[in-house]
Amino acid sequence: MNKRRLKKALRRLINLPGGIYFFLYIINKIRHFYLKAIKSTRVAYPSTIMLELTNQCNLACTICPREYDYGKAMDKGKMSVESAKKIIDELWPYLDSIGLTGMGETFLYNEIEEIVDYIKTKNKGIIISVSTNAVLPNFIEKVSKIVDKVDTIQISIDGLDDVYEHIRKNASFQELDRNLRLLAKITSNTNTDIMLNMVVTKENYSHMPTLVKYTEEIGIKYMDFTLLNLASVTNIDRSYYDFYQSSHFSYVLSELDDTINKTPSVLVTERNFRTDNNFQKCPYPWTHFYICWNGYIAPCCAKPFPKELNFGNVFNTKVINVLNDTSYKRFRSLWYKNITPDFCDKCHFVDLESIK
């Protein structure tokens, strides 16, 4: 566990639910470990969820599933405040964390502060994270309202300068840079961490070491690297993954490791590209449950398209009923057998060979 996650865990332990809710929380934890021990396909109430408040966005990024077949076919909209609160009411005694993010730009949801405040009234120890592209007009004004209320603001930065603008269509790197520097100052000495996230592609991978230096230069402490997931990118063949095996990619990874060692003020929280991949590496059948803006629970955040696959709608029944629906349990049974569902075709958890 890295320092950032340890800090969050300690904050959570200090602020566990009180009274009868503490016993509900503990009983649910015991149930979780019991079901895991007996290899059940059922799950306890979730300790973490992703709540997609909106799937609308101001950008058209080349790496985003919204820009391909599944994304173009999806219904677009935003979750009502009442629906979001209903989900929180049902789950809060069991939650350790909640991500207010999804296929859209979080700060297009005008009631974001109201939702954050509502979660905190339930239990101030619930860890809240949001993701953003940080280039909306008046972004600083919007984000300032939840600084010191949320625990992590993750910001997408898929390269620098022209490479960034090539990938993140309709975005300006100059505007992003200005907002990042301002936000770093605003969040200084608060309980809100800023973390930059880069999706590693053929077009930008050489920027990885430079991005660590840039993160240090603008006064941000955390950086994350993730690989491009082709599960929802319909017009790119899985052979795209081959470049991750190239000698030059390996060279840049070594350069990245060297830069990280020389930049102790920046903690790179995720860059583990070298593990073996198969369906059982995927955690999403069991955790980080994804609730779409229209109430459907999709299998994961990499392919959150209810028209392709969903296990039920939480607006029609309780969340726990959907999580333990027969179709969801059947999906989990494949995980135990390490049989990849057709839905997961091209996912990097499965089809990307371990990077040597």
Spell out what each predicted region is:
Residues 56, 60, 281, 343:
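The −1 position to Zn-ligating cysteines in a subset of zinc-ribbon hairpins
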